[in-house]
Swiss-Prot record:
CDD domains: DHOD_2_like (cd04738). Substrate binds at K66, N111, R112, M113, G114, F115, N172, N177, N246, T247. This is Dihydroorotate dehydrogenase (quinone). Monomer. It comes from Vibrio atlanticus (strain LGP32) (Vibrio splendidus (strain Mel32)).
């Protein structure tokens, strides 16, 4: 009820202004009596995945807390894990505004943010200040002005800097809002990137005395053959997990709706079915070789269960959280 009232107010604002205001309020009120409005104690539903123990299988997807400013707030809401970022080596402003749009009737969101963030060093300082005791994922990407043929360098820079602070590292090569980025999902480009990341992982494991898993985040807009090739590369390079999926460029489900023609990636309920199909295809190809984190339209216990029945070990929420609020986390966890 409280969230529905708050949402009514927030939805009167421009989508990005509402997002920024929410982040500011979470920063301001976490640790004060006001955070009782969203703090919740949930039953433990531990899941072993990528060599880590997650308190429960429901995580926050990357993109909501790009700079790691509200880790403790999201921890208080009962998430089993929190993924921050996407973060790049250098700060960047992202794409021109407006760049975030609600498709309310479809419970979807279109964004063309463009990896706006304050840079990896800023994120690390925020992580250091956090008291969160759950699994923290850090999602890394490349700067827009880094040539795609040198993209691996950006991932390696970020990986080296975040390694000791991350529970796992998510490698984002699937955002549609950085020109050329999705080309890294294919063929030799993917093999070369994963090989370099795996080599760096071994070096950093020796340096820091701990193993931090790597998970690759992929797009929903892939053919079965492309998914098969990605799976081959994941297994060949001994990557620890795969996150499926990012946002879609497909607009067929939202055709005719307000904002449907805005450029960018579509998330939320409209991508639910396709992302679940990608999870299912990945599971057919991978079996138990590496775990899948399912994301895309997880806006209810039923949607979460569908992802898990398709083969996901964990799930993440973002757009569903915007539309349903923190209660969504509890609804999923309590019903599993």
């Amino acid at each position: 009820m409280l969230y529905r009232l708050a949402r009514t107010g927030f939805f009167q604002l421009d989508a990005e202004k509402a997002h920024d205001l929410a982040i500011q309020n979470f920063k301001r009120f976490t640790g004060t009596p006001i955070d009782l409005l969203y703090r919740q104690q949930l039953p433990n539903r531990p899941v072993e995945c990528m060599g880590l123990t997650f308190k429960n299988p429901v995580g926050l997807a990357a993109g909501l807390d790009k700079n790691g400013e509200c880790i403790d707030a999201f921890g208080a809401m009962g998430f089993g894990f929190v993924e921050v970022g996407t973060v790049t080596p250098r700060p960047q402003a992202g794409n021109d505004k407006p760049r975030l749009f609600r498709l309310v009737e479809a419970e979807g969101i279109i964004n063309r943010m463009g990896f706006n963030n304050l840079g990896v060093d800023n994120l690390i300082e925020n992580v250091k200040k956090s008291n969160y005791d759950g699994i923290l994922g850090i999602n890394i990407g490349k700067n827009k002005d880094t040539p795609i043929e040198k993209g691996a360098e950006d991932y390696l820079i970020c990986m080296e800097k975040v390694y000791q602070y991350a529970g796992y590292i998510a490698v984002n090569i699937s955002s549609p809002n950085t020109p050329g980025l999705r080309s890294l999902q294919y063929g030799e480009a993917l093999d070369d990137l994963l090989s370099e990341l795996k080599t760096k992982q071994s070096e950093l494991e020796e340096k820091h005395g701990k193993y931090v898993p790597l998970a690759l985040k992929i797009a929903p807009d892939l053919s079965d053959d492309e998914i098969s090739q990605i799976c081959e590369s994941l297994i060949k390079n001994k990557i620890d997990g795969v996150i499926a999926t990012n946002t879609t460029l497909d607009r067929s489900i939202v055709e005719g709706m307000k904002h449907c023609d805005e450029a960018g990636g579509l998330s939320g309920r409209p991508v639910q079915s396709r992302s679940t199909e990608v999870v299912r295809k990945l599971h057919e190809e991978l079996g138990d070789a590496l775990p899948i984190i399912g994301v895309g339209g997880v806006d209810s216990y039923v949607a979460a269960k569908e992802k898990m029945m398709a083969g996901a070990k964990l799930v993440q929420v973002y757009s569903g959280f915007i539309y349903k609020g923190p209660g969504l986390v509890g609804d999923i966890v309590k019903n599993l």
